[in-house]
Each structure stands twice: as structure tokens, then as C-alpha cells.
Amino acid sequence: MHDRLIIFDTTLRDGEQSPGASMTRDEKVRIARALERLKVDVIEAGFPAASPGDFEAVQAVARTIKDSRVCGLARALDRDIDRAGEALKDAQRARIHTFIATSPIHMRHKLQMSPDQVVEYAVKAVKRARQYTDDVEFSPEDAGRSEEDFLCRILEAVIDAGATTLNIPDTVGYAFPEQFGHMIGRLIERIPNSDKAVFSVHCHNDLGLAVANSLAAVLHGARQVECTINGLGERAGNAALEEIVMAVRTRKDIFPCHTDIETREIVACSKLVSSITGFPIQPNKAIVGANAFAHESGIHQDGVLKSRETYEIMSAEDVGWSTNRMVLGKHSGRNAFRTRMQELGIEFASEEELNSVFQRFKVLADKKHEIFDEDLQALITEAGAEAEDERVKLVALRVCSETGEIPHAQVTIKVDNEERTGTSSGGGAVDASLKAIESLLHTDTALTLYSVNNITSGTDAQGEVTVRLEKGGRIVNGQGADTDIVIASAKAYVNAVNKLLAPIQRTHPQVGDV
């Protein structure tokens, strides 16, 4: 018998905790829509109690998503659970995910509570969450370093209290596949009422074993895996959704389960998350990397030409890679533009939004002879960033650069609708431009990353620039794209500055009193 494996995506919550990967409300909604097209079972939209912005983002996702279940994270605190319940009240299907630490070191030093008190708080939290929804997930934080007898005790208690999913996290990425898989199997066997709940795992990648640990758990009875697109997450990241899904699909001889994921949406969703967060996909990344289905060796190439199955264990088309590329240009009409966007999984909320992005497309088409899918994705990302309430806007940029001379840049920006113009010189055109912007803003930030990637091939290709700024412990990424790399750099810098200027008071889910 083949059971269904539930795919729980936490890109919007745990993935966003990657330094610099913060997303706006509208960006989260766009990713949530992509996850829904991917047919993800559960979308963890955020931690509503973290900040007003997080609450609004979870609320917006809950109001938008119709098919996937929308989940909100909450500590085992009444105020957190109530906040999650309020954010999720408009969801078609809601889940509250509550947790408390269960390892001796966490109970003693972080919670300063006895094991009995921890069980009491966990049971109380689950019962309160059940007042808002009949779908409640419970996680014993730092389960990998918890005593197994205590884990059995607290998990049995929360099932009796109404928990329908039990999630076992490897919080610090310390577990090893054989050991972790056997632990899941023992918990299922030892807990008397384990048949009344779905067992789930949430693995971190500190030792590069997140996917392996998750799959080992599936082999021992886990029927939900928590994962993220591209493996995005804190520190070394989380288990990569695309790798979990394709491993289970490809090795049906090993795994006694299946997922309902629409795998042809994987690559599009991966590119969207990468574009929004500014975290590039490494070329040799499994499934979604540019080289994942490339063959350099002559022997391999010869084999693939004769029969793809000789060196390919899965089809590139099955995960969304396509050789059928529709190329648009300046003569392409609005209908062709809309149709291609729909084929890429991009829907517009209104005719006004469609018209706005189409006008950007026409401007780009005047600069480029051919517009590829990657150009369209960049247009959407840029339009989404500028749709927010930005305090700083780039108005004009003029650069003077001659051989043997120091480059100069003149920049005009709007700050809270007040126009400002400044000039600066630098070691190059990009350096001069960014210095000119900084001279008008005085943000006193540190530029810790500057990278350029060509979106497509050709000398008229758009360049996509990612910058990372740090100030006062905050880290943000900014993105910009243009056929002129200097303008793309200025756009990226302004995008990052706007994120820094946005007010934020966020509580980390693993920090705070109980």
C-alpha cells in the first residue's frame, strides 16, 4: 500500500529567517500562489506574533490561498496562539503550529521549567489552538537532544489534547540518517495513541544531511516532511522540497508513499524564490540547478543522444525545464504577453497590474531584440518591489566615464516624495553611482555583497544585480535588473535601502519567554 506523503512548505517562515532573505507581504503572497500551483499540502505562511508585518503577511496569504492549507507558527503562549488564530480566521483551511523546547538543556536554561511544567504548557497550548481550528501541529523543539522517554510522554499527552500532527525537528542539524530514522520509528511504536496523529519531520542542513534525514524518517513511518524551496533557511538551510519530492517520485521501489506535488511547477517556483530573496541557485544544485541536466563528458553526451535514460534518472521536463521557449519582442501584443505570463504561472491581480507590467515590457522590448522567460520573471520581481510603499525611488542616473579619467555619477532620487540630486566620483561607474546615492541618504550602511548575473545570453542581455547591506545587526538583500548594469546596480541599492528603512520589530520564534 502506498500512503500519501504530506509536503509542508516553510519557505515563507523558516526560509525567510536566512540572513537577508526578508520578504514583503506582497512577495510572500506571490510565492504562496506559486506554492499553491505546485500543489503543496501545507504552506507555513509565517509567525504572526513576530511583528505587525508578519501578522499582515499571514493574513494576506490566508485570504488568498484556496487549495493549500495555510499554517501559522505560535509558541506555547496564549498570546501567540490567539494572534495566529486571528491571522488565519479567513483561511479556507487553517492550521496552527505550536511548539515548546523539550531537551534538558533548553528546559533548564532557556525555559527554566521542570518537565512537568513543559508538558502542562504543551497540553494547554494545543487545547487553546483547537479553539480556532481542528488542525493543530505540535513540535518538541530540539527533539534530537531530548530524552526519548520524555518525548514519548509529552507527545502522547498532546495527542490526547487534540494535536493531529506531531513534528519532530532536528533543530541544530546534528542527526544522522540511520539514527534519526530509527528514532522516528521507535516513537511511533512506543506511543500508544500514535495512530491518531501524522508524524512529521523538520530537518536542518548543518551537516548536509537534511534531505537524507528526512527521507530516512519517511522510511520509518513519517508521513509529513517540512521543507523549503531551494533548501532556503537559517544557517545551512533546510531540507530542499524539490529533492524530497523527486527522490520519492524517482525511487518508488524504495519509498512506500507518494506526493501530490505538480512537479512541472518546481523550476518556476525555484526561480521565483531565488529572484525575490536574492539567493542565487548554485549551478550544480540537484533538480533546479542550471547544470542539473547538462552533460559535458563526450561519453555521457553520446549515451544521452542515443537514449536519455542512459545518464538521466528523471526527465528535465517533468520538473519544469523546457526547451520550448517562446520569444517575445517589441511587436508582441498584450494578449501574447498575458498568455506567456500565464504559462509561466504568473497571474495578475487586476487589469491595472497587467497594464503596468506590460508597459514595463514594452520599454524593455525597445532595448532588447528578444525577450525571454527570464526577462519576464525579472520584470515581475521589479514591479513587485516597486509596488510596495517605498520611501526612496530612483528618478535619474547620469554617468561620465572616460579612459584614464575618474568616473563621475549624478543621481536624482525621491525621498518621501522630495526630490534630491547628488554627485560623486568612484573607482568605477557603479562605485560612483552608489556613492552618489549614499551621499543623499546618509544611511551609514556596510555593503557586504555585490554580485552580477546575466539573465539571458547576448550583449543586450539584462544584468541582474544583488547587493547586501548591513546596519545595526540587520541584513537585507536588494535586487535590480536592467540592460545597463550601472542602472541595475542603482536599482538594487535603492531596493535594499528601502528594506532597511522599513520599520520592523520582529520576535524570533525561538526567542522569548514562555
UniProtKB/Swiss-Prot annotation:
Q: Where is this region: Regulatory domain?
A: 393-514
This entry's Enzyme Commission designation comes to: 2.3.3.13
What's the domain of life for this entry? Bacteria
Needed cofactors: Mn(2+)
What EC class does the entry list?
transferase
Membrane spanning stretches: none
Q: Which CDD domains match?
A: DRE_TIM_IPMS
One Pfam family, short name please? HMGL-like
Positions of the Pyruvate carboxyltransferase domain: 5-267
Sorted alphabetically, which PROSITE patterns does this protein's record hold? Answer: AIPM_HOMOCIT_SYNTH_1, AIPM_HOMOCIT_SYNTH_2, PYR_CT
This protein's UniProt keywords: Amino-acid biosynthesis, Branched-chain amino acid biosynthesis, Cytoplasm, Leucine biosynthesis, Manganese, Metal-binding, Transferase
Q: What's the main place this protein lives?
A: cytoplasm
Please state where this protein is localized: Cytoplasm
* Catalyses which reaction(s): 3-methyl-2-oxobutanoate + acetyl-CoA + H2O = (2S)-2-isopropylmalate + CoA + H(+)
Q: Name one GO biological process term.
A: L-leucine biosynthetic process
- GO CC, alphabetical: cytosol
Xref: InterPro entries: 2-IPM_HCS-like, 2-isopropylmalate_synth_dimer, AIPM/Hcit_synth_CS, Aldolase_TIM, LeuA/HCS_post-cat, LeuA_allosteric_dom_sf, LeuA_bact_synth, PYR_CT
PANTHER family found in the cross-reference section: 2-ISOPROPYLMALATE SYNTHASE 1, CHLOROPLASTIC-RELATED, HOMOCITRATE SYNTHASE-RELATED
Indicate the quaternary assembly.
Homodimer.
Q: Which NCBIfam families match?
A: leuA_bact (TIGR00973), PRK00915.1-3 (NF002086), PRK00915.1-4 (NF002087)
Q: Which family does it belong to?
A: Belongs to the alpha-IPM synthase/homocitrate synthase family. LeuA type 1 subfamily.
UniProt protein name? 2-isopropylmalate synthase
Q: Which organism is it from?
A: Methylococcus capsulatus (strain ATCC 33009 / NCIMB 11132 / Bath)
